[in-house]
Amino acid sequence: MVRVRLAPSPTGTLHIGTARTAVFNWLYARRQQGSFLLRIEDTDKERSKPEYTQNILEGLRWLGIDWDEEPLIQSEQVQQHRAAIETLLQKGLAYRCYANEAELDAMREAQKASNQAPRYDNRHRNLTPEQEAAFQSEGREAVIRFRIDDNAEIRWNDMVRGAMSWRGADLGGDMVVARRAPADQIGDPLYNLVVVVDDAAMAISHVIRGEDHIANTAKQLLLYEALDLPAPTFAHAPLILNAEGRKLSKRDGVTSINDFRTMGYTAEAIANYMTLLGWSVPEGMEERFTLPEAAAVFSFDRVNKAGARFDWDKLNWLNGQVLHALPAQQLLDDLRPLWAEQGWTLPDDSSWGLELCELLGPSLTLLKEGVEQATPFFKCPDLEDDGVRQLEADGARTAVAQLLQILEAEPWDGKDTDRAKQLLADAAKGAGVKKGVVMKSLRAALLGRLQGPDLITTWCLLARIGEDLPRLQRCLA
């Protein structure tokens, strides 16, 4: 049975790279009718925080990604991690290294001076008991290193990249698997070791992650073999790149799912776009889809090896498509809290908010634009330059005065669009101007500018809350 996992570290909010990894794992699990699991890798005691764990879980739920078992907390598995290290020590596959930081720094400087690649030189791999005792008598603490044979050939078949091969000599020397501690203890176990132990304990069948983990995969495969554990199948997805082709980072600005939410992107658009960052849709499939729709056809045959460039225009287009297709009630539910933050309340007329959303929805690219575009419907706007020019144009004041005269003589409630059109025609005839003059002047009076949504619907909505006459009257003041 397929079992995959997402293993975020709660040292920050949910990152776009982690979100894309989550999407690929979830899609593969659902496609294969397998299980998608979570493991919270909280072993960085100083930087891990419960609020980050909560943020990650909430972010995944927001994206529509659910998991099938209770999340495993890595810090709660430390006894199993230490037991695995003890096994390696007993087998002679790991050893204590007493080299201190000053000695290691000197080693690196010497390598740099001779243009050698930085690596541990395995200097304490074969210490005699007497040498170990001498270091211990100095009070030295020790890290624990896993032996890596320079002649080892590590091979695996990657679901994205095909046949992969690494030489042991390219892995930087014997690998630290536990932090420095007194010689009679095992220090805090480190990433590559604990990942192997946890993945085996969770019966993970496929490890799906970014290509920046390829070197880790080579190291971990050696650990699987050393611990007599079954190795999973690996898939290394392409990195997400910025516009210049470099790995997307915090320096590029928005990288947190929180930021995307704040900017007004929808969960559906973000999840959709995360899928497209490295995966090509099958022929005949639209690029706009839901996660369940993608899961029905997802495979790693269509995941690219090359890095995926983040394209803001593409994301904006997708988000606009999602917003344009939202039912009015759902858009209203999404916008209501944003409007409430502005101190705006909807009128008692329950259909008014829905009709406003039907009016604004087709023009939205970001959800937050629903605040800016709704502003004239909740408070009287200032006149902008183009609005002022229109109201100062020939015939404009006459047209506004004529329309006001008709409305004061024949009040209407804004519920009849045909009546609105007739009122405009009557005002144009009475003022002796073209109907376009009346319409432009009405738009300037109501919205303060000449650009905006459908005029008749706008007028009807404002008339229903008694906002049309005061705005017309101010233009004649």
UniProtKB/Swiss-Prot annotation:
Gene Ontology annotations of biological process type: glutamyl-tRNA aminoacylation
Motif ('KMSKS' region): 247-251
Motif 'HIGH' region location, chain numbering: 8-18
Gene Ontology CC terms, in alphabetical order: cytosol
EC number(s) reported in the record: 6.1.1.17
Family annotation (CDD domains): GluRS_core
Enzymatic class: ligase
GO molecular function: ATP binding; glutamate-tRNA ligase activity; tRNA binding; zinc ion binding
Domain of life, source organism: Bacteria
Catalyses which reaction(s): tRNA(Glu) + L-glutamate + ATP = L-glutamyl-tRNA(Glu) + AMP + diphosphate
Subcellular location per the Swiss-Prot or TrEMBL entry: Cytoplasm
HAMAP family found in the cross-reference section: Glu_tRNA_synth_type1 (MF_00022)
Known function: Catalyzes the attachment of glutamate to tRNA(Glu) in a two-step reaction: glutamate is first activated by ATP to form Glu-AMP and then transferred to the acceptor end of tRNA(Glu).
Subunit record text: Monomer.
Protein name: Glutamate--tRNA ligase
